[in-house]
């Protein structure tokens, strides 16, 4: 019998142990069963957390695609006035940052979160609650990052906040500080994911 965590119980036969109790499989399935309804958002099972990462990463991919579309509309014809200079630079900065830190890195981590326990014939990651915390930290940080577009807190420093463009002469406001704060928060979740 296979559980929803895709753990193959025939792997128990490899180990020279005594016969397992008949109720053990049912008890493990009961323990690892995900909560129902809205409580499912509190699940710590690696399959659910990995799925959340994939869905969230594709949501951020869509947001970055909308930013790229705005930039392409601006560049479609000469002397276009669709985006202002600062807004274009903000779109450029946000597009690169979202694609790198909120799509590419979490997608690779999601594959690891979903496949690693199955490759090791384990029920879950060693620290499943830390993995769930990392997802929620990434989700909250990424959402605040996207919302910074609507409150005018996006810097104009390029994909990785190039130092000449973030100096006081080019970027006098606190936008770069806000970007660094949120990237630090998102990278905190990346460190928690890697543990």
Language-model region placement:
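...captures the hydrophobic TM-helix bundle architecture rather than a specific catalytic motif
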Residues: 2-195
């Amino acid at each position: 019998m296979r559980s929803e965590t895709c753990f193959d119980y025939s792997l128990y036969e490899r180990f020279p142990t005594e016969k397992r109790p008949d109720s053990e499989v049912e008890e493990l399935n009961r323990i690892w069963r995900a909560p129902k309804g809205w409580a499912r958002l509190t699940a710590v099972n690696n399959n659910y957390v990995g799925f959340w990462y994939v869905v969230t990463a594709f949501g951020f991919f869509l947001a970055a695609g909308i930013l790229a579309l705005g930039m392409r509309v601006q560049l479609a014809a000469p002397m276009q006035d669709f985006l202002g200079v600062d807004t274009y630079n903000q779109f450029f900065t946000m597009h690169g940052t979202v694609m790198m830190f909120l799509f590419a890195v979490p997608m690779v981590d999601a594959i690891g979160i979903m496949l690693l326990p199955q490759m090791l014939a384990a029920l879950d990651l060693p620290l499943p609650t830390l993995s769930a915390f990392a997802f929620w930290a990434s989700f909250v940080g990424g959402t605040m990052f996207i919302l910074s577009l609507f409150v005018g807190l996006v810097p104009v420093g390029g994909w990785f906040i190039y130092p000449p463009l973030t100096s006081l002469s080019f970027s006098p406001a606190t936008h770069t500080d806000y970007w660094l704060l949120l990237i630090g928060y998102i990278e905190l979740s990346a460190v928690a994911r890697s543990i």
